[in-house]
């Protein structure tokens, strides 16, 4: 499961398998956060 706040927010939590989806859905900055995908 992934928790996605409004687009442009800094903090983004990724769930297993949702990492790639989160990176695409959120701003590029999200890719720098912890991504256990």
UniProtKB/Swiss-Prot annotation:
GO terms for biological process: chorion-containing eggshell formation. It holds the Pfam family Chorion_1. Residues 1-26 are annotated as: Central domain. GO terms for cellular component: egg chorion. Residues 27-37 are annotated as: Right arm. The keyword Flavoprotein does not apply. Keywords: Repeat. One of its GO terms (molecular function) is structural constituent of egg chorion. It comes from the Eukaryota. Belongs to the chorion protein family. This protein is one of many from the eggshell of the silk moth. This is Chorion class CB protein PCH12. It comes from Antheraea polyphemus. The lineage of its organism: Eukaryota, Metazoa, Ecdysozoa, Arthropoda, Hexapoda.
